[in-house]
Regions:
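Short Gly/Thr/Asp-enriched flexible loops that form oxyanion-binding sites at enzyme active sites
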Residues: 68-81
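ATP/nucleoside-binding phosphotransfer catalytic cores, i.e., glycine-rich phosphate-binding loops
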Residues: 179, 185, 210, 220-296
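Gly/Ser/Thr-rich active-site loops/lids in small-molecule metabolic enzymes
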Residues: 149-157, 202-228
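ATP/NTP phosphate-donor binding region
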Residues: 1-60, 70, 296
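Catalytic core of DAGKc-family lipid kinases
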Residues: 8, 17, 22, 27-31, ...
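Short aromatic-hydrophobic micro-motifs that form the base-stacking/packing surface
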Residues: 61, 84
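Glycine-rich phosphate/pyrophosphate-binding beta-alpha loops
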Residues: 134, 192-206, 272
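N-terminal glycine-rich "phosphate-gripper" loop used for MgATP/nucleotide binding
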Residues: 62-66
């Protein structure tokens, strides 16, 4: 009996062009897979994902960028269905970390082979994330970038302008981190929480070799002013971030972030939203079944 799959395509993703849904359907048919395609707007992905997750298909496939994949994955957490990935976004960090090919035909070949593993998922105040979450500088950059894009600016131009503006006006955060029976008071421009550990060397910066170690990795830069942040960016590109004196890296399975404010802007997998403080993070080990290439 052929596999039955449902494909959720984010029509607004970076690489979605006219005819892509027909191409996807044709490639699945060639692989002997019965695929039902849903092309949806970004605002409706969570609703469609919940509906499809409750259906009768064997596999639910997210076709889009990391935000799309994260939303679909959230509907499948701790459930029996497998997640398939078609990387159609701009960066596609999640699919790259899993070793999934970046072209659609090859990614469909991986789905057809149906080799699955279980991976961890992060959780902040009940919201899941597959890559990372952060507070401070980055979510404010994303918010301003989206405002500029709505005014007709290109994505990369808007991101660069928003980053420069935030470097000029962003206040430092004063936070208290509670983890592993310890409390750390910090003044920082950001707190970055990864689902498992990120590589910091020059050739693999921003990559994750494993997504099944059951840890949150926490990164922050203690207050040194904005020139300190510029220095950090340069050191990041040189693969020297861990040698930065005021850069901190922690690992835990649960983290609470307290602050004076009652609400704060939070990024999860590149999507931003306001959340109530305190922020309660935890790792959910082996919570998601995902299709990946077989290990050689």
């Amino acid at each position: 009996m052929p596999l039955s799959v449902e494909v959720i395509v984010n029509g607004g993703s970076g690489c979605v062009t006219d005819g892509v849904c027909d191409e996807i359907a044709s490639l699945f048919a060639d692989a002997g897979i019965d695929a039902r395609i849903h092309q949806v707007d970004s605002q409706n992905i969570d609703e469609i994902a919940e509906h499809v997750a409750a259906g009768n298909s064997d596999i639910v496939i997210a076709a889009g960028g990391d935000g799309t994949i994260g939303t679909v994955a959230s509907a499948l957490v701790n459930g029996p269905k497998s997640l398939g990935v078609l990387p159609l976004g701009t960066l596609n960090n999640f699919s790259k970390d899993l070793g999934i090919p970046q072209d659609v035909p090859s990614a469909i070949d991986i789905i057809a082979a149906n080799h699955t593993v279980r991976i961890d998922v992060g959780n902040v105040n009940g919201r899941h994330f597959i890559n990372n979450s952060s507070i401070g500088l980055y979510p404010r950059i994303v918010r301003d970038r989206e405002k500029l894009q709505r005014l007709g600016r290109g994505k990369w131009w808007a991101a660069a302008w928003a980053a420069l503006r935030m470097m000029q006006i962003s206040p430092f955060l004063r936070v208290k981190l509670k983890l592993d029976n310890d409390e750390l008071a910090r003044k920082t421009l950001f707190v970055f929480i990864g689902n498992n550990a990120y590589e910091m060397d020059l050739y693999n910066i921003g990559r994750r070799s494993r997504l099944d170690r059951g840890v949150l990795s926490v990164y922050l830069l203690r207050g040194r002013g904005r020139w300190g942040v510029i220095s950090m960016v340069i050191r990041t590109f040189l693969g020297l971030l861990r040698q930065t004196k005021n850069f901190e890296e922690l690992q835990t399975d649960e983290l609470t972030i307290e602050m004076r404010r009652k609400k704060i802007l939070v990024a999860t997998d590149g999507e931003v939203s306001m959340m109530d403080a305190p922020l309660r993070y935890k790792i959910e080990p082996s919570a998601l079944n995902v299709i990946v290439p077989r290990s050689e």
